[in-house]
C-alpha cells in the first residue's frame, strides 16, 4: 500500500542503519517481552489457524501513522495480532480492555478487499527482461514503490511457491501460489543519473511482473 508503510521505505525518517559485508548482527530481542510478539502471532497463525502471516503484516500496515511512530517494532506486531484476534472472534475488545485495565487501541479497520494473482501465463526465465507493473494498490502488497514501471533482468526464479500476498493478506485462502523472482535493476534506472553506479536486486512475486516490451533475454 502507498504511504508510510511502503516496503521500500519512506522519506523524512532518516537513514536505515546497516553494515556492508558484515557477519555481525544486532541482538534480535532487546527486552524480555519482545519474543512474545512472534509467539502470540504464531498462536493465531499455526495453533488457532485464524489468520496468515500476511494478514498480520497488513494489520501492521493498518496502524495509524501516529500510533506506528510511537511504538516499537514488536509492539506493532502485538497490536496487529490483537487486532486480528478481535476481528476473527477469538476475543472481544471489551475482554481485551478488561484484561489490561485500560482501552487497547487496535489497528484501523481494513478498507480494501485485496486482489487475485495473475495466472495462466508461462513463467519468466533467467535472463528475461521484465518490467514491474505500474500499479497503485490500496491494500496489502509486497512490492516497493520505487520499482514501479522499471525494467530489470531476472537473475533467479525460486523453486518454492507462496500464496500471492495481495490476496492472502486479506484472508483469501484460495490465493494462487507463485514463485518469486530476483530481479536486477540499474541504480540509475531507479533513481536517476545523479545516483551512484551499481545494481539493486529486488525479490518480486510473479504477478508484479510483465515481459518488457520488445525485450530480448540477457545471457545469464
From Swiss-Prot:
Industrial production of acrylamide is now being developed using some of these enzymes. Keywords: Lyase. Pfam families: NHase_beta_C, NHase_beta_N. Its EC number is 4.2.1.84. GO terms for molecular function: nitrile hydratase activity; transition metal ion binding. The keyword Lyase applies. The keyword Transmembrane helix does not apply. It comes from the Bacteria. It catalyses: an aliphatic primary amide = an aliphatic nitrile + H2O. Heterodimer of an alpha and a beta chain. NHase catalyzes the hydration of various nitrile compounds to the corresponding amides. Belongs to the nitrile hydratase subunit beta family. This is Nitrile hydratase subunit beta. It comes from Pseudomonas chlororaphis (Pseudomonas aureofaciens). The gene is nthB.
Amino acid at each position: 500500500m502507498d504511504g508510510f508503510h511502503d516496503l521500500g521505505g519512506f522519506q523524512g525518517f532518516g537513514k536505515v542503519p546497516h553494515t556492508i559485508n558484515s557477519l555481525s548482527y544486532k541482538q534480535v530481542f532487546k527486552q524480555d517481552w519482545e519474543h512474545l510478539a512472534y509467539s502470540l502471532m504464531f498462536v493465531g497463525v499455526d495453533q488457532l489457524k485464524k489468520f496468515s502471516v500476511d494478514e498480520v503484516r497488513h494489520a501492521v500496515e493498518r496502524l495509524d501513522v501516529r500510533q506506528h511512530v510511537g511504538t516499537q517494532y514488536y509492539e506493532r506486531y502485538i497490536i496487529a495480532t490483537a487486532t486480528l484476534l478481535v476481528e476473527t472472534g477469538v476475543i472481544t475488545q471489551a475482554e481485551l480492555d478488561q484484561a489490561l485495565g485500560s482501552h487497547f487501541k487496535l489497528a484501523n479497520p481494513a478498507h480494501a478487499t485485496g486482489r487475485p494473482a495473475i495466472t495462466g501465463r508461462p513463467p519468466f526465465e533467467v535472463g528475461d527482461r521484465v518490467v514491474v507493473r505500474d500499479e497503485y494498490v490500496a491494500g496489502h502488497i509486497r512490492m516497493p514503490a520505487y520499482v514501479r514501471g522499471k525494467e530489470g533482468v531476472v537473475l533467479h526464479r525460486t523453486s518454492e511457491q507462496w500464496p500471492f500476498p495481495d490476496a492472502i493478506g486479506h484472508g483469501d485462502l484460495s490465493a494462487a501460489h507463485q514463485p518469486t523472482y530476483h530481479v536486477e535493476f540499474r541504480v540509475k534506472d531507479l533513481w536517476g543519473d545523479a545516483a551512484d553506479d551499481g545494481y539493486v536486486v529486488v525479490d518480486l512475486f510473479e504477478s508484479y511482473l510483465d515481459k518488457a516490451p520488445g525485450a530480448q533475454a540477457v545471457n545469464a
